[in-house]
Amino acid sequence: MPPKTRSGARRGGRRVVKKNVAAGHAYIKSTFNNTIVSITDPHGAVISWASSGHVGFKGSRKSTPFAAQMAAENAARKAMDHGMKKVDVFVKGPGSGRETAIRSLQAAGLEVSSITDATPQPHNGCRPTKRRKV
């Protein structure tokens, strides 16, 4: 009996489907502890993402601007493999990696057409965290 042949994906792995998307949105969520960059198509389907922890930083190093830069470059590189050229950037949160992440998206080769600050503002909602005693 002849051996069975496999067609399609390799065993146990995921098949990477190349999407051909020219423009999309980049969402940068920058908290005090981490920075997460998600790049989507115009409909909101995620094409690529990266975070400071995903790139390899641990602990307090995740909150640095350099970690945000590496995460944004990683996400931009993956998105450009799918044909992405132009992004609208939406920034959320008070973290230290906001501006660095935007600059590294541009440096990676993506054309940034607009930057929007989408940080949620409470209308006297949850109580904020207490002041640090250093």
UniProtKB/Swiss-Prot annotation:
InterPro entries: Ribosomal_uS11 (IPR001971), Ribosomal_uS11_bac-type (IPR019981), Ribosomal_uS11_CS (IPR018102), Ribosomal_uS11_sf (IPR036967)
Name the UniProt record assigns to this protein: Small ribosomal subunit protein uS11
Compositional bias segments (type: Polar residues): 113-122
Subunit structure: Part of the 30S ribosomal subunit. Interacts with proteins S7 and S18. Binds to IF-3.
Disulfide bonds: none
Pfam families xref list: Ribosomal_S11
Function: Located on the platform of the 30S subunit, it bridges several disparate RNA helices of the 16S rRNA. Forms part of the Shine-Dalgarno cleft in the 70S ribosome.
Gene Ontology molecular-function annotations: rRNA binding; structural constituent of ribosome
Any one of the GO CC terms: ribonucleoprotein complex
Location of region: Disordered: 113-134
Entry keywords, A to Z: Ribonucleoprotein, Ribosomal protein, RNA-binding, rRNA-binding
Family the UniProt entry places it in: Belongs to the universal ribosomal protein uS11 family.
Gene Ontology terms describing biological process: translation
